[in-house]
From Swiss-Prot:
The keyword Isomerase applies. It catalyses: (S)-4-amino-5-oxopentanoate = 5-aminolevulinate. It comes from Mycobacterium tuberculosis (strain ATCC 25618 / H37Rv). This is Glutamate-1-semialdehyde 2,1-aminomutase. The keyword Isomerase applies. Its cofactor is pyridoxal 5'-phosphate. It is found in: Cytoplasm. NCBIfam families: hemL, PRK00062.1.
């Protein structure tokens, strides 16, 4: 029995109730989950069914407690069930769950975002990051009168058809980019968008140009050929959906210059980085003035809410002021808005200092344990987000991320889970810390890591 199977079998007894719940879920929900990565497909074993969470601790249906290093895939910077957020949500819910009409809090949340990200002059609230990027792309096309969109291999912008081409996140985790019928696109050459999922038609992705990430030469060549047809370039401000792979120095600024030269828009997707890596998101680290931004996760406080915004000149093309249609029955939901406002207002300088310090501490523990076990690795960072890539080669794009030794990750993951630490269940997902991590949590992480590192060291490629 290999170390992955051993790790999985050790936790199976401790996850008996979760296993029963998963079996029941599979009878009514495709794959037993409502978002594919949660199924543990990449690592094997039984998904943990979480019943409650407080601070930095998750509690599953079997009563097991885990240090949370996923944070609901990013939003929970304050930790779970933060008193200020819970109180705000309870008060909002007591006044009514949804009105289908404007509310004062919507304007307050929009103002909070505008006050943090200088290029954003107008905001439209939506319900998910997918809606935010989908709407931003539609608006860019409507504003410019052009059709083509440039995106980057490994960047994930939700599951909107036009952007689900060579995407990261769950698409990478499930290997949907690995279809042998898909032609490879050589570095520094543009490729026509090829759908990453059945059900996405070739026509839907035909106006999507996919380029290798961090390759500004490929961008310049593409604009030289298609510049008058390109409506926008969309990129994660700092990608976290092929693992954490930050932009090279000046990459986003170069995108800004090239798009401006050709009359195209730049869309920075800050759904993941926004208000997590700094008070102003990635813009606070690398202040590139994009035309449009997409936000989600932290600004929702963990509720279903997101937003897109940007220059007033562009945003005023949206209905009801302009002809570009976008709408949503539950957009600006008062309970979700209350959670977002409470989170942003509670996230003071001390919170961001704690997030950075906790990420530093976690990265140090990871590297120390893996070095001691003689496991080749890279700890890739973007502010307080990080990823562990196994291998000697630095990861700078999707190709190098996929070339890393991902076969080591399942054993590493299960050894951590077995010891009461909950890391991301895919090598292509980011690790997230909260400000609620304390010495007890770090003690558990430190105790778990040596065995996890040894498990990774013992793995061999299939």
């Amino acid at each position: 029995m290999g170390s992955t199977e051993q790790a999985t079998s050790r936790v199976r007894g401790a996850a008996r109730t979760s296993a029963q719940l998963f079996e029941a879920a599979c009878s009514v929900i495709p794959g037993g989950v409502n978002s594919p990565v949660r199924a543990f497909t990449a690592v094997g074993g039984t998904p943990r069914f979480i019943t409650e969470a407080h601070g930095c601790w998750l509690i599953d249906a079997d009563g097991n407690r885990y240090v949370d290093l996923v944070c609901s895939w990013g939003p929970m910077i304050l930790g779970h069930a933060h008193p200020a957020v819970v109180e705000a949500v309870a008060k909002a819910a007591a006044r009514g769950l949804s009105f289908g009409a404007p509310t004062p809090a919507e304007t307050q949340l929009a103002g909070e975002i505008i006050g943090r990200v200088a290029p954003v002059e107008r905001i439209r609230l939506v319900n998910s990051g997918t809606e935010a990027t989908m709407s931003a792309v539609r608006l860019a096309r409507g504003f410019t009168g052009r059709a083509k969109i440039v995106k980057f291999s490994g960047c994930y912008h939700g599951h909107v058809d036009a952007l689900l081409a060579d995407a990261g996140s769950g698409v990478a985790t499930l290997g949907l980019c690995d279809d042998p019928q898909r032609p490879a696109s050589p570095r520094s050459q543009s490729s026509r968008g090829l759908p990453s999922s059945p059900g996405v038609t070739g026509a839907a992705a035909a106006d999507t140009i996919v380029l290798p990430y961090n390759d500004i030469d490929a961008v310049q060549q593409t604009f030289a050929r298609f510049g008058e047809q390109i409506a926008a370039v969309i990129t994660e401000a700092s990608p976290g959906n092929m693992g954490v792979v930050p932009p090279g120095p000046g990459f986003n600024a170069a995108l800004r210059a090239i798009t401006a030269e050709h009359g195209a828009l730049l869309i920075l997707d800050e759904v993941m980085t926004g208000f997590r890596v700094s008070r102003s998101g990635w813009y606070g680290i690398d202040p590139v003035p994009a035309d449009l931004f997409a936000f989600g996760k932290v600004m929702s406080g963990g509720m279903p809410a997101a937003a897109f915004g940007g220059r007033a000149e562009v945003m005023q093309r949206l209905a009801p002021l302009g002809p570009v249609y976008q709408a949503g029955t539950l957009s600006g939901n008062p309970v979700a808005v209350a959670a977002g406002l409470a989170t942003l207002r509670a996230a003071d300088d001390a919170v961001y200092t704690a997030l950075d310090a906790n990420a530093d501490r976690l990265a140090g523990l990871l590297s120390e344990a893996l070095t001691d076990a003689v496991v080749p690795h890279q700890i890739s960072r973007a502010g307080n987000m990080l990823s562990v890539f196994f291998g000697e080669t630095p990861v700078t794009d999707f190709a190098s991320a996929r070339a890393s030794q991902t076969w080591r990750y399942p054993a590493f993951f299960h050894a951590m889970l077995d010891a009461g630490v909950y890391p991301p269940c895919s090598a292509f997902e980011a690790w997230f810390v909260s400000a609620a991590l304390d010495d007890a949590a770090f003690g558990r992480i430190a105790n778990a890591l040596p065995a996890a590192a040894r498990a990774a060291a013992q793995e061999r490629p299939a």
